[in-house]
Design a protein with these regions (language model features):
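Positively charged n-region of N-terminal signal peptides that target proteins for export
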Residues: 1-4, 369
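Bacterial N-terminal signal peptides
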Residues: 6-15
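Acidic, Gly/Ser/Thr-rich repeat motifs that build Ca2+-stabilized beta-propeller blades
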Residues: 20-175, 231-234, 238, 288-325, ...
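Surface-exposed loop and turn segments in beta-propeller and other repeat-based domains
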Residues: 73-85, 136-152, 194-214, 257-286
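Beta-propeller blade signature
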Residues: 117-127, 181-194, 248
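Repeat-solenoid scaffold signature
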Residues: 209-249
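Active-site Gly/Thr loop motif
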Residues: 219, 264-275, 290-291, 319, ...
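Conserved blade-ending motifs and adjacent loop-strand segments that build the rim/top face
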Residues: 329-349
Length: 369
């Protein structure tokens, strides 16, 4: 009897320590809980299949595919944690395998009670105890100007196939900066990998931060992804409704706050996009809101029917939204109810889809077939 009890206890511990997998009748995929994290914000895969995961309060972690979580890395900059601010996105340099460069975005403090987003790059190494450390960290970009408040940082990043770095910069809940070309708030930014400004940027001759700008008129762009044609798309939170999926084009103005398919939270109306055809309109938009966070363009083999689709992390509906594109048109075709706010979504090396829940006690999920 004692041997049987010990055997059952051992099996019980094994089950509890292994990733938990489930499949519901409502979802066309299996969901495996890999790990639990505290306010995770972004993740990216290393060449060996492990994940780098950021937590908003300022921790950078290594997570194995079996759910083992490292101690927090050292060498990070000072993070201004609070409101919507903290440690944000993380991406690898396109030549990471040879240069070991990673890029992080985060909120930082300025003078007084002013804040702004920043992007830094560093060499990722591991010490003799296999503890992660960021070395030779350098800040390559900052929001300008820094302003009061702790919202709408944006600060998503994506490299294109030519090695240019694109950064989404929110308008910091100040409305008008999105149309102010003397600052880089409410813009999509295009830089070289070292933070220098390409001389073929549309406003390069204007100099200063204006030279960084690729497109303008953005509100709170929380997702950036390239499709299989190399075109850049972004998800963008509208005001009261009017969330957007935009095809981001060189030198185009996306209209906020002059136009939006949403309205101000005060109830004050904003003219719709169709009233101002001189601004670039979204390819699709949502009312009611989906509060879109990150998006990916799916190209894997595991979910063949999802190819040519964007998968969007939906905070408000607690769902993953699938959008199909056809040339320059876009249409939502499916919505998968996850039952919890979704902050981040990435495609794994084997075509599985990995998801980060939002908030404290948030799960890292792996979706498979």
């Amino acid at each position: 009897m004692n041997k049987l009890f010990l055997l059952l206890a051992a099996l019980s511990c094994l089950i509890l320590s292994s990733p938990a997998s489930s499949k519901t009748a409502d979802l066309p995929f299996s969901v495996t809980t890999v790990a639990e994290l505290d306010e995770p914000w972004a993740m990216t895969f290393l060449p060996d299949g492990q994940l780098l995961v950021t937590e908003k309060a300022g921790q950078l972690l290594l997570v194995s595919q079996s759910g083992e979580i490292s101690k927090p890395f050292s060498g990070l900059p000072e993070i201004a944690y609070g409101g919507q601010g903290g440690l944000g996105d993380i991406v690898l340099h396109p030549n990471y395998s040879s240069n070991r460069l990673i890029y992080i975005s985060y909120a930082e403090s300025g003078e007084g009670n002013q804040y702004g987003a920043a992007v830094a790059r560093a060499i990722l190494n591991f010490d003799d105890k296999q503890q992660g450390v960021l070395e030779n960290l350098e800040v390559i970009w900052r929001q300008s100007p820094k302003v009061s408040g702790k919202g709408h940082y944006g600060h998503r990043m994506a490299f294109d196939d030519q090695g240019f770095l694109f950064i989404s910069s929110g308008e910091r809940q100040k409305f008008d900066p999105a149309q102010d070309m003397t600052g880089n708030l409410g813009k999509i930014i295009r830089l070289h990998d070292d933070g220098s400004i390409p001389d073929d940027n549309p406003f390069f001759k204007e100099g200063g931060v204006t030279a960084q700008i690729w497109s303008s008129g953005h509100r709170n762009p929380l997702g950036l992804a390239f499709d299989d044609q190399g075109r850049l798309w972004n998800t963008e939170m509208g005001p009261l409704h009017g969330d957007e999926l935009n095809l981001v084009k060189r030198a185009k103005n996306y209209g906020y706050p002059t136009v939006s398919n949403g309205d101000h939270y005060s109830g004050k109306k904003i003219p719709d996009h169709d009233t101002r055809p001189d601004f670039e309109a979204p390819k699709t938009w949502w009312k009611p809101t989906i509060a879109p966070a990150e998006l990916i363009y799916y190209s894997g083999d595991m979910f063949v029917d999802w190819r040519n689709s964007f998968l969007i992390a939906g905070l408000k509906p607690k769902a993953i939204i699938r959008v199909v594109i056809d040339d320059e048109s876009a249409k939502e075709v499916e919505r998968f109810d996850m039952g919890v706010r979704i902050r981040e979504i990435e495609q794994g090396p084997d075509g599985a889809v990995w998801v980060l829940e939002d908030g404290t006690e948030a799960k890292l999920l792996k979706l498979t077939r």
